[in-house]
C-alpha cells in the first residue's frame, strides 16, 4: 500500500509540520498587523479659484496651478459674488497634489501604486430662486484636465496627462438656509482613477462650462467649495505586500515541482485531484509573481486590471478546487469510470464559471475603459450605478450561496464517512487503528478547508472595502485591515502548500509484518501491518487499483459497494 503522505506520515512528523505551518500563519498576521500601515491613505484638497483668459479657454494644453513660480492669482469668493456674471466660463478650480507639509513640498512615490479621485460639490441658489426641494440626479458637465510633472522639472513644467468632458449626476441635501442664498451639499462623485502612480506631482483643472442653447449647467446656481479627496495605496503596505509575495513565490514553485515529480514516478496517470492541485498551485504562483516591482521602473497603467485578472483566476481555481476536493471525498459515484470535470462537476461549476465571467466583464467595462480615459466610471450615471450595484450584490449573494453549498458537501462527506465507520469493529486492531487515524486526519483537513473558505470570503469583502477605510484613526497601533489581508494571503499559500505535501503520493513500500503485540507499534508500523491485509480491498471495481490516491477512498468505496 502506498497512498498519500497524509496517510503514511507518522504522528510526530505530522505534528511538527502542522505546528510549523501554524507558526507561519501567525507570522503573516503579525507582519501586516505590526509593520504594515493601512492599505490606503488619502489627502483632502480644497480647490483654489483662478480666473482664465478668454483667449486660452479652448487651449487644452493651457494649465493653471496654485503653487510655485508662475502660479495663478487666486480669486476670492467675494470677488466672484461681486461680479455681475459670477465670472461665468472664466473660473477654473485648481487642485495640486500632494499638499505640502511643514513648509516642505511632498511628492508621490511609485510604491503608492495608484490614485483615485472623488469630488464633493457644494453650490448655492439665491433665496429668490423658485427651487425649494433639494435637487436629485442633476446632470453636471465638467471639463477635466489632469497633468503631471516630476522632480527636477520647473514649476511650470506641467504636462497634460488626460483631458475629457464628462457628465456626473448629483444628489444633494440642504446644508444651509440664509437670508440671501441656500447652500446645497452633494454626495461624493467619482472623478478619476489612475492605475499607475508613476509621477511625482499631479494637477487637476476643473471647469464648469455654461451654455444657454444646450442648457449646459444652467440648472445650478453658482459653485461654492469643491473638495477633492485623492486616495492612494500606502507605500509601506505595498512594501510589506511585495515582501510577502517575494518570500512565498519560490516556496510554492519548489513544492509544485516536488509534487509533480512524485506523481510522475508512479506507474499510473495522475488522478483528477492531483491535476486540480497542480492547477491550483499554478494559479497561486501566477498570483504570487511580484510583477509590481516592474511598476517602480516602468509606467504600467494596466497594473490594476492585471492584478484583478490574476486574483480572479486564483479565486476561480480555488472555488473550483474546493468543489472537486469535497466531491472526490464524497465517494458516492456508482460507475467505475475515472472522474473528470466534465462528467461529474459541470453542474456544480457552471455557477462559478458564470459568476467569474460576469465579474470579468464588469471589470473590463470599468478598468479596461479607464486605460484610455481615466475619468470614466460606470458609477457616474444612475443606470450604471444600479447595474454596478446589482453586480456587486449578486457577487456577494453568490459567494454566500457557494459557501453554504460547500458546507453542505463537506457535511455529506462527514456523514458518509461516519456511516462507513460501522464496519471498523469487524477489522483487526491494526487495520482499525489505521483507518481511525486516517479519518481523524481527514476531518481535521476538511475543517481547515472550511475555515479557509470562510476567511477567503471575508477577505474578499474587506479587500473591496479597503479603499473606503481611509478615514480610520491613524493612531491605531495594530491595523486590523492590513493584518487581515496579509493573514488571508499567507493562509492561501500555507493551505495550498500543505495540500501539495499531504496529498503527494507516498513512496513507502511497507513489508508484510507478522507480530502479536500491535499495541506497541508506532503509527508507521500500524500502516505497515495494515498493508498485509490489503487483500480485503483488492477487488474494488475501480479503474485499476494503482489509480487510487487514498486508502481512505478505497475504504469508503469498498463498504459502499458491499
Swiss-Prot record:
Gene Ontology cellular-component annotations: cell projection; endoplasmic reticulum membrane; endosome membrane; Golgi membrane; neuromuscular junction; plasma membrane; postsynaptic membrane; presynaptic membrane
Record's protein name: Protein wntless
Main localization category: membrane
Alphabetized InterPro entries for the sequence: WLS-like_TM (IPR047843), WLS_GOLD (IPR053936), Wntless (IPR009551)
One of the protein's GO biological processes: positive regulation of protein secretion
Domain of life of the source: Eukaryota
Glycosylation sites recorded in the entry for this protein: 58
Sequence ranges on the Lumenal membrane side: 35-239, 292-311, 366-390, 463-482
Family: Belongs to the wntless family.
Transmembrane feature ranges: 14-34, 240-260, 271-291, 312-332, 345-365, 391-411, 442-462, 483-503
The protein's assembly and partners: Interacts with wg; in the Golgi. Interacts with Vps35, a component of the retromer complex; wls stability is regulated by Vps35.
Keyword terms: Cell membrane, Cell projection, Developmental protein, Endoplasmic reticulum, Endosome, Glycoprotein, Golgi apparatus, Membrane, Postsynaptic cell membrane, Segmentation polarity protein, Synapse, Transmembrane, Transmembrane helix, Wnt signaling pathway
Membrane-protein topology: Multi-pass membrane protein
Compartments (UniProt record): Presynaptic cell membrane; Postsynaptic cell membrane; Cell membrane; Endoplasmic reticulum membrane
GO molecular function term, any single one: Wnt-protein binding
Intervals, Cytoplasmic compartment: 1-13, 261-270, 333-344, 412-441, 504-562
Function description: A segment polarity gene required for wingless (wg)-dependent patterning processes, acting in both wg-sending cells and wg-target cells. In non-neuronal cells wls directs wg secretion. The wls traffic loop encompasses the Golgi, the cell surface, an endocytic compartment and a retrograde route leading back to the Golgi, and involves clathrin-mediated endocytosis and the retromer complex (a conserved protein complex consisting of Vps35 and Vps26). In neuronal cells (the larval motorneuron NMJ), the wg signal moves across the synapse via the release of wls-containing exosome-like vesicles.
Amino acid at each position: 500500500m502506498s497512498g498519500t503522505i497524509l496517510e503514511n506520515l507518522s504522528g510526530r512528523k505530522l505534528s511538527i509540520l502542522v505546528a510549523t505551518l501554524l507558526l507561519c500563519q501567525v507570522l503573516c498576521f503579525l507582519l501586516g498587523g505590526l509593520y504594515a500601515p493601512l492599505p490606503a491613505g488619502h489627502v483632502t484638497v480644497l480647490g483654489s479659484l483662478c480666473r482664465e483668459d478668454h483667449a486660452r479657454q479652448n487651449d487644452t494644453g493651457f494649465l493653471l496651478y496654485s503653487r510655485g513660480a508662475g502660479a495663478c492669482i487666486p480669486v476670492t469668493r467675494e470677488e466672484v459674488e461681486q461680479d455681475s456674471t459670477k465670472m461665468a466660463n472664466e473660473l477654473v478650480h485648481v487642485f495640486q497634489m500632494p499638499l505640502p507639509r511643514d513648509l516642505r513640498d511632498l511628492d508621490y512615490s511609485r510604491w503608492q501604486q495608484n490614485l483615485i479621485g472623488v469630488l464633493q460639490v457644494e453650490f448655492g441658489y439665491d433665496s429668490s430662486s423658485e427651487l425649494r426641494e433639494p435637487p436629485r440626479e442633476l446632470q453636471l458637465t465638467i471639463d477635466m484636465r489632469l497633468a503631471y510633472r516630476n522632480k527636477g522639472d520647473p514649476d511650470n513644467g506641467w504636462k497634460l496627462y488626460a483631458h475629457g468632458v464628462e457628465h456626473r449626476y448629483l444628489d444633494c441635501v440642504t446644508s444651509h438656509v440664509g437670508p440671501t442664498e441656500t447652500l446645497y451639499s452633494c454626495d461624493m462623485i467619482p472623478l478619476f482613477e489612475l492605475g499607475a502612480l508613476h509621477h511625482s506631482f499631479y494637477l487637476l483643472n476643473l471647469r464648469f462650462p455654461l451654455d444657454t442653447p444646450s442648457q449646459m449647467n444652467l440648472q445650478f446656481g453658482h459653485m461654492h467649495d469643491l473638495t477633492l479627496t485623492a486616495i492612494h495605496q500606502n507605500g509601506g503596505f505595498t512594501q510589506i505586500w511585495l515582501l510577502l509575495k517575494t518570500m512565498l513565490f519560490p516556496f510554492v514553485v519548489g513544492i509544485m515541482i516536488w509534487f509533480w515529480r512524485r506523481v510522475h514516478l508512479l506507474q499510473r496517470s495522475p488522478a483528477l485531484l492531483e491535476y486540480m492541485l497542480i492547477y491550483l498551485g499554478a494559479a497561486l504562483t501566477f498570483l504570487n509573481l511580484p510583477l509590481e516591482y516592474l511598476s517602480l521602473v516602468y509606467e504600467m497603467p494596466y497594473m490594476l486590471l492585471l492584478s484583478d485578472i490574476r486574483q480572479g483566476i486564483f479565486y476561480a481555481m480555488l472555488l473550483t478546487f474546493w468543489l472537486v476536493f469535497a466531491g472526490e471525498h464524497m465517494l458516492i459515484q456508482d460507475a467505475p469510470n475515472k472522474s473528470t470535470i466534465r462528467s461529474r462537476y459541470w453542474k456544480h461549476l457552471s455557477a462559478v464559471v458564470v459568476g467569474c465571467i460576469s465579474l470579468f466583464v464588469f471589470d473590463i467595462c470599468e478598468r479596461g475603459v479607464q486605460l484610455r480615459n481615466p475619468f470614466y466610471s460606470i458609477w457616474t450615471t444612475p443606470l450604471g450605478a444600479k447595474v454596478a450595484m446589482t453586480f456587486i450584490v449578486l457577487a456577494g449573494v453568490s459567494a454566500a450561496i457557494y459557501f453554504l453549498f460547500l458546507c453542505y458537501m463537506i457535511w455529506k462527506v462527514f456523514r458518509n464517512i461516519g456511516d462507513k465507520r460501522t464496519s471498523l469493529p469487524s477489522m483487526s486492531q491494526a487495520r482499525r487503528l489505521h483507518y481511525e487515524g486516517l479519518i481523524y486526519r481527514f476531518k481535521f483537513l476538511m475543517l481547515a478547508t472550511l475555515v479557509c473558505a470562510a476567511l477567503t470570503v471575508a477577505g474578499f469583502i474587506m479587500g473591496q472595502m479597503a479603499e473606503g477605510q481611509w478615514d480610520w484613526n491613524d493612531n491605531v497601533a495594530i491595523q486590523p485591515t492590513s493584518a487581515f489581508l496579509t493573514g488571508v494571503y499567507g493562509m492561501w499559500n500555507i493551505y495550498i502548500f500543505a495540500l501539495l505535501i499531504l496529498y503527494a503520493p507516498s513512496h513507502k513500500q511497507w513489508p508484510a509484518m507478522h507480530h502479536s503485540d500491535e499495541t506497541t507499534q508506532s503509527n508507521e508500523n500500524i500502516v505497515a501491518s495494515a498493508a498485509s491485509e490489503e487483500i480485503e480491498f483488492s477487488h474494488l471495481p475501480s479503474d485499476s487499483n494503482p489509480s487510487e490516491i487514498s486508502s481512505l477512498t478505497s475504504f469508503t468505496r469498498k463498504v459502499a459497494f458491499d
